[in-house]
């Protein structure tokens, strides 16, 4: 009986090690996306604000690619009923992986002015300390031109 239990425990251990803990990633134009993420190209309307509504959970949901012009000042805001939804903004024109903005609780708005024409990747993220099945959260991202 002890031998059977040891074999069963060893089998479970091997099976758990072979399953990846996070989603696989793929590179799209120099930006890493999780397999569950869809890249969606968006653009500012001729007048008014750009509003992006969606749902996200760890490694799943839409991420947005926005073309921005040099010298154009934009205010980007995130709203969600969940305190665990944050937003990261990356610049496709910069080779490093650092976000040019990463929101946190109480700081979900930024004002950015690019020095050159570029594209931003806007990624809403649901941050949970432990994975839970089926959990996700709705969000609204608003991009406004500033004077």
Predicted features and spans:
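N-terminal beta-hairpin/loop module of FHA
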Residues: 40-53
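Short linear Ser/Thr-Pro motifs
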Residues: 16-18, 80
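Bacterial N-terminal signal peptides
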Residues: 8-16
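Sec/Tat signal peptide C-region and signal peptidase I cleavage site
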Residues: 19-23
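Exposed loop/turn and edge beta-strand positions of beta-sandwich/beta-sheet ligand-binding modules
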Residues: 46, 105-106, 137
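Acidic, Ser/Thr/Pro-rich low-complexity intrinsically disordered segments
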Residues: 55-127
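Bacterial N-terminal signal peptides that target proteins for export
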Residues: 1-9
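C-terminal edge strands of extracellular/lumenal beta-sandwich accessory domains
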Residues: 24-42, 64, 120-147
């Amino acid at each position: 009986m002890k031998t059977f239990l040891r074999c069963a425990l060893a089998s479970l251990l091997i099976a758990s090690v072979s399953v990846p803990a996070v989603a696989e990633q793929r590179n799209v134009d120099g930006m890493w996306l999780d397999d569950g993420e869809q890249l969606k190209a968006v653009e500012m309307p001729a007048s008014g604000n750009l509003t992006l509504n969606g749902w996200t959970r760890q490694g799943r949901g839409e991420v947005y690619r926005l073309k921005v012009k040099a010298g154009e000042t934009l205010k980007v805001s995130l709203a969600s009923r969940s305190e665990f939804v944050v937003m990261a903004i990356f610049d496709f024109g910069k080779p490093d992986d650092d976000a040019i903005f990463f929101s946190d609780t109480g700081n979900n708005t930024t004002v950015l002015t690019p020095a050159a024409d570029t594209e931003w990747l806007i990624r809403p993220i649901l941050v949970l300390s432990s994975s839970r099945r089926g959990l996700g959260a709705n969000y609204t991202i608003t991009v406004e031109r500033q004077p």
